[in-house]
């Protein structure tokens, strides 16, 4: 049964169905597979269940969590076919795919002349290739022909070099072969292997049939084509499926989903006959989702449009409004500042100013690399020095900042200490035998006595005792000392980082406040160490990946702990919509920025044409681009306004870079306020 509404999905209704099925199964809730669109919903659903009504652990999972567990449990069913060398798959960290593919692009580009007519950097090409792979996996289309498909939809394909698109597919093949060889999986490979390999095995389908009697899906609009294949298997096995959803605001572009294909499957049921898809021409499709007329009832929720000439003036307007709201303690916890994606500078300026003005906030935005945080970068530098990694270079400024933090001194003094001790500090890249001598000489004691003290197996190494036994210990010896001792103990890089944090950084002025970001660096390092042990990367590459590719992320528990009724929320439109937030006061920042509604077709990337519902080799025209952008803008506005009580918009005539700032977003807002057709 599929229940598709044109209103917000009622979580209570879905939970009631779940409770009803639990009663039917006499509390055996493990027989019910409940797939939710977001992990944040799991706790809400569990809290709605009568704890006395079930006798087993509820199987409430996201689709990704479910397939990851299934792959780990049933890996042996597909490992022989894949010629995998290990019995259990290794999940690689999110930072690794971009690094591996960028390295491949660099190699193929300069060694074999690949991507000759592509103007982007190797890193940008890598992002496009990985985006194509991810989209194809979600769309359940051939992951090895994404470049070819995109090429044939280009309006100017006759003037393009086809090889640049087939080379996209070669890189994907090279990348996936490398992962499979090492029994490693990332997100798109997990989706692909589960859907194309494991789910098609008769033995696995029998296992599913034995374990589950029901399937519940809470959100059809956030269901991928790959997830639909699981639904089809349940239907084929004669199991009951219950699918709920809301197609009033089509935001599937955010999720790489294909609502056309999903609705077409369910439209075969009688109650959905009216949704039967007929016209597959993108330029004409407006079958569901919000129309402009659906926005009109919300127009009175936009209370004021602040327009300034300069970018800095716009920021001041945002801060002025934030201060005004913050005066009312009841309002601040109901307020969200929503900024377009990729606005790191705007985010930094707003958060910096809020902090100075004493306004509490929490941010869900993770545009920053981990290394952009001072304490995190300090740990990365220390880890590289500990590993003796000569393959990575840090700037003088980074060393000075590290010394300034550890010693609690200003940068002028830190610079002086660095200049005086640069050789000693950088000597950590030397072999242990050479470091032994430098370390001993710096304390004016004999090498033999010192080494004997360190290597005495019958006594526990006590850093304080060592410090007390040496005269004239230099401030920087604290760093060198821990590196030396860590090496003698043969500690892993991540374990050394953990000890350095707990023994040194946590004692510093802001040490405790930086626990979370330091934990993230250490956790990321542990995952990269596992990847190195599998042979996916070399050990010396760990430091480079940590510095250049590892991104900040916000865990659900961390976000929950940071939220509060006394804090402003700073977020992006897509995160806000997906978070089911109930903040009725919204401040839309930088509405002249086109990232509110970004370009769909890029040089070698276009997720739309990778959809199953997109006709093969159909040219993606400028008209398609404009109509879809307008379509998604209407749906974005609908989804934001639907949860709003008061909206304040902010725009500057000139962008951060000094260009005239105009966007479809702002035009839509003005027309909506004037109730004009757009």
Label for each model-derived stretch:
Residues 1-6, 103-216, 225, 305-310:
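Accessory N-terminal region flanking or inserted into the helicase ATPase core
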Residues 29-137:
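Conserved P-loop NTPase-based nucleic-acid remodeling module centered on helicase motor cores
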Residues 34-36, 60, 239-246, 649:
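Structural recognition of the conserved hydrophobic beta-strand(s) that form the central parallel beta-sheet
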Residues 329-481:
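ATPase/helicase motor core of nucleic-acid motors
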Residues 570, 579-596:
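A short beta-strand element within the Helicase C-terminal
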Residues 589-670:
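C-terminal accessory regions
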């Amino acid at each position: 049964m599929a229940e598709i509404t044109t209103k917000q999905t009622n979580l209570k209704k879905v939970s009631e169905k779940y409770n009803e099925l639990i009663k039917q199964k006499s509390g055996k809730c493990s027989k019910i597979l409940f797939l939710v669109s977001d992990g944040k919903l799991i706790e809400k659903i569990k809290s709605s269940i009568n704890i006395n009504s079930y006798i087993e652990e509820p199987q409430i999972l996201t689709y990704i969590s479910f397939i990851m567990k299934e792959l780990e449990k049933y890996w042996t069913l597909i490992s022989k076919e894949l010629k995998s060398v290990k019995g259990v798959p290794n999940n690689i960290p999110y930072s690794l795919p971009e690094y591996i593919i960028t390295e491949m692009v660099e190699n193929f580009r300069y060694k074999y002349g690949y991507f000759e007519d592509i103007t982007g950097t190797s890193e940008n090409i890598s992002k496009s290739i990985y985006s194509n792979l991810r989209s194809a996996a979600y769309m359940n289309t051939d992951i090895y022909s994404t470049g070819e498909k995109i090429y044939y939809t280009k309006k100017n394909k006759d003037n393009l070099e086809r090889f640049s698109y087939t080379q996209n597919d070669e890189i994907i093949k090279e990348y996936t072969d490398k992962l499979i060889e090492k029994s490693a999986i990332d997100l798109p490979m997990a989706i692909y292997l589960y859907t194309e390999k494991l789910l098609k095995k008769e033995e696995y389908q029998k296992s599913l049939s034995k374990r589950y009697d029901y399937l519940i899906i809470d959100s059809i609009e956030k269901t991928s084509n790959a997830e639909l294949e699981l639904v089809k298997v349940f239907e084929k096995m004669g199991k009951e499926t219950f699918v709920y959803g809301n197609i009033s605001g089509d935001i599937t572009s955010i999720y790489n989903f294909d609502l056309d294909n999903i609705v077409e499957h369910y439209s075969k049921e009688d109650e959905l006959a009216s949704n039967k898809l007929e016209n597959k021409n993108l330029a004409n499709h407006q079958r569901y989702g919000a129309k402009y007329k659906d926005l009109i009832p919300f127009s009175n929720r936009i209370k004021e449009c602040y327009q300034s000439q300069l970018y800095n003036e716009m920021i001041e307007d945002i801060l002025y409004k934030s201060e005004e709201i913050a005066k009312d303690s009841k309002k601040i916890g109901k307020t969200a500042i929503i900024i377009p994606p990729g606005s790191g500078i705007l985010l930094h300026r707003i958060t910096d100013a809020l902090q100075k003005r004493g306004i509490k906030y929490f941010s869900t935005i993770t545009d920053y690399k981990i290394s952009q945080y001072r304490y995190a970068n300090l740990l990365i530098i220390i880890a590289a020095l500990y590993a003796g990694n000569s393959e990575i270079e840090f700037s003088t400024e980074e060393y000075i900042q590290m010394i300034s933090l550890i010693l609690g001194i200003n940068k002028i003094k830190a610079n002086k200490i660095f200049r005086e001790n640069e050789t000693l500090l950088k000597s950590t890249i030397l072999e242990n035998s050479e470091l032994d001598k430098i370390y001993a000489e710096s304390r004016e004691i004999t090498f033999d006595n010192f080494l004997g003290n360190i290597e005495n197996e019958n006594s526990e190494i006590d850093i304080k005792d060592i410090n007390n036994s040496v005269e004239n210990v230099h401030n920087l010896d604290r760093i060198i000392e821990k590196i030396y001792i860590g090496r003698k103990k043969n500690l892993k890089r991540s374990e050394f980082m953990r000890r350095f944090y707990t023994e040194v950084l946590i004692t510093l002025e802001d040490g405790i406040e930086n626990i979370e970001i330091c934990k993230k660096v250490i956790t990321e390092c542990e995952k990269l160490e596992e990847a190195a042990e599998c042979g996916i990367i070399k050990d010396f590459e760990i430091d480079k990946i940590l510095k250049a590719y590892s991104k900040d992320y916000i865990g659900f528990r961390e976000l929950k702990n940071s939220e509060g009724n006394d804090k402003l929320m700073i977020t992006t439109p897509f995160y806000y919509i997906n978070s089911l937030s109930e903040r009725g006061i919204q401040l839309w920042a930088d509405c002249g920025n086109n990232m509110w509604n970004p370009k769909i077709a890029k040089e070698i990337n276009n997720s739309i044409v990778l959809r199953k519902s997109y006709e093969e080799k159909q040219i993606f025209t400028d008209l398609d681009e404009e109509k879809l952008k307008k379509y998604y803008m209407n749906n974005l506005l609908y989804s934001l306004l639907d949860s709003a009580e008061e909206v304040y918009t902010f725009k500057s005539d000139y962008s951060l870079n000094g260009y005239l700032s105009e966007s479809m977003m702002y035009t839509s807002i003005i027309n909506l306020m004037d109730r004009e057709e757009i």
